[in-house]
Amino acid sequence: PFRYATPENKWASMFLDYIPKWLSVRDPEVLNGYYQGASTLYTKHTLLTWATPVLMWSLFIMALLFVMLCLTVILRKQWTEHEKLTYPLVHLPLDLSSEKTPFFKNRLLWAGIAVAVAIDLIQGMHVLYPSVPGLKIKEINLADFITTYPWNAIGWCPVSFYPFAIGLGALLPLDLSFSSWFFFIFWKLELVLAAWKGWNEIPRFPYVNEQSFGAYMGICLFAIWSGRKHFSRILTSFFTGHGDLDDASEPMRYRTAVLGMIIGAAVLVVFVRAMGMAWWLIFVFFGIYFALSVGITRMRAELGPPAHDLHAAGPDSIIPMLINPAKLGTPNLVVLSMMFWFNRAYRAHPMPFQLEGFKMAERASIG
């Protein structure tokens, strides 16, 4: 924002003063080098300018990841041993690395690889040499053929043929494969119904992002409720110092995990409070964030979707929808905006990878 602030947009008077100096780069010379190029990072002035923001954000990231790691330790036994979730996505790397599984001797595997490689080669040649015929397998928009009201309210409706997606789909349980396309069609029918009834004049109707947010929160609540006995025993053991839990084979002791969560959460709270966010909003923000994290991790462990985006439905977006932005105030809105980078979408959310790593270690008898 410091780069693009102008007298016309009035950013300087509106919110720039609320951005912490220790988390941002303001030096015009350094910013010019970053945006325009023809410069180098390796000067004393540039390195010192970047040092504080990089170190501070690194501290924040490490605390965030550490809390997730401790949380996965608490969840692991309940989901892996008690509920016996399948972790569909760990099977492929385990089979690839196993000497006992004749993975690369499967003729159907090589036939599938040959088809995918042939398609990619043809498409690549078509891009480089347009005279080579290409295959019409990407982004056929059905909306181009549906022009009658209210059916044309479906909007962009792509049909694509991606071999890698078909291969990953083979790893997914049938109920997830079904729900993936069913709810896509259901969403499009919601748009048609809204157009038919005239509800499409309502901004953002039918509130798909909010529906998705509610679904993830529901998955989180279900996961916590189904493991309530296990989690209560962990808390009892933490507060009393004794219990019947056997955590000798866990990645870390349960008491250590709970204590680590508390310490990591304290670091996050102090950090964000220093940024300028109100105390109550800090707990709401991270409560929503970690609830979404648990929901995403549960879905990945049980069903294994390779992508779990949640655009515009993280706490940085949901909170201003639930609470009047004018009541939140500029300082809180600025800090929420600075949290956008790890809440834009959750396709590469680290917590599922952490739990899948524990599952792979268990299957491979590591640790």
Range-by-range predicted roles:
Residues 1-351:
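Transmembrane-helix bundle segments that line or gate the permeation/cavity pathway
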Residues 360-367:
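Long hydrophobic segments that form regular secondary structure
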